């Protein structure tokens, strides 16, 4: 199993970097076209106007939020994803509000954001130092919204295969959905399921406690 975990980690690293240009196609295939809808499940949970997206990927949700009037910033470690996102924004007449940064070292002031979003994040979302940083840059009462755990409805062989593949590739990265494991003293956590005609997806909403300082 450890060898499998290493193989999956290697594959995802390639997908996020050298093969980032295939990311949108791959995500559409493995989700049977539900990927963007799954990402957008975060939007109704946002509060305020200042939003940070962690690991923005190819920038689809970052663009959606910007187009809807949110004052967004996105961070990602992948130069290839940054180039794809920057090009997407330029083609639409905007500069991409992005920078390269780690969740464990966010280059923003305390209370800089009203909401934060991460869709299908890697293991960093469960890292206590990253969670402390996320709490630090959120205003008291601010929201961290995490979308995770997509599941396609239906019992046909292709759907069963995709759901199985999603489980065995995502699980090695986090052991379980972030919505089931996320825990930090600075946050009060709620977990929800968003259902549409073809699929369901998990949404975690972690509200920054007003009387709890990060690191205290």
Label the model's feature ranges.
Residues 1-46, 60, 64, 159-166:
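Conserved class I S-adenosyl-L-methionine
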Residues 10, 146-202:
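C-terminal alpha-helical "lid/dimerization" subdomain adjacent to the S-adenosyl-L-methionine
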Residues 52-54, 58-105:
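Class I SAM-dependent methyltransferase SAM/SAH-binding core
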Residues 104-116:
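A short acidic, Gly/Pro-enriched loop at the edge of an enzyme's catalytic core
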Residues 115-128:
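A short SAM/SAH-binding and catalytic strip from SAM-dependent methyltransferases
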Residues 129-140:
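A short glycine-rich, Lys/Arg-flanked "PGG" loop and its adjoining helix->strand segment in the class I
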Residues 204-216:
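C-terminal lobe and adjacent flexible extensions of AdoMet/dcAdoMet transferase-like proteins
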């Amino acid at each position: 199993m450890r060898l499998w975990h290493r193989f999956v980690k290697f594959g995802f690293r390639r997908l996020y970097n050298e093969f980032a240009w295939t990311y949108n196609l791959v995500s559409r295939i493995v989700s049977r076209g539900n990927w963007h809808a799954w990402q957008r499940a975060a939007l109704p949970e946002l509060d305020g106007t200042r939003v940070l997206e962690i690991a923005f990927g190819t920038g689809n949700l970052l663009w959606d939020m910007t187009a809807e009037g949110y004052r967004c910033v996105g961070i990602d470690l992948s130069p290839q994803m940054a180039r794809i996102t920057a090009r997407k924004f330029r083609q639409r007449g905007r500069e991409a509000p992005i920078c390269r940064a780690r969740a464990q070292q966010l280059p923003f002031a305390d209370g800089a954001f009203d909401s934060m979003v991460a869709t299908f994040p890697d293991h960093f979302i469960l890292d206590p130092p990253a969670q402390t940083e996320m709490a630090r840059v959120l205003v008291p009462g601010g929201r961290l919204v995490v979308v995770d755990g997509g599941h396609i409805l239906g019992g046909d062989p292709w759907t069963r295969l995709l759901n199985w593949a999603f489980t065995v590739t995502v699980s090695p990265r986090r052991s379980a959905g972030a919505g089931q494991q996320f825990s930090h003293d600075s946050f009060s956590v709620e977990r929800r399921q968003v259902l549409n005609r073809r699929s369901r997806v998990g949404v975690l909403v972690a509200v920054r406690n007003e009387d709890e300082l990060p690191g205290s």
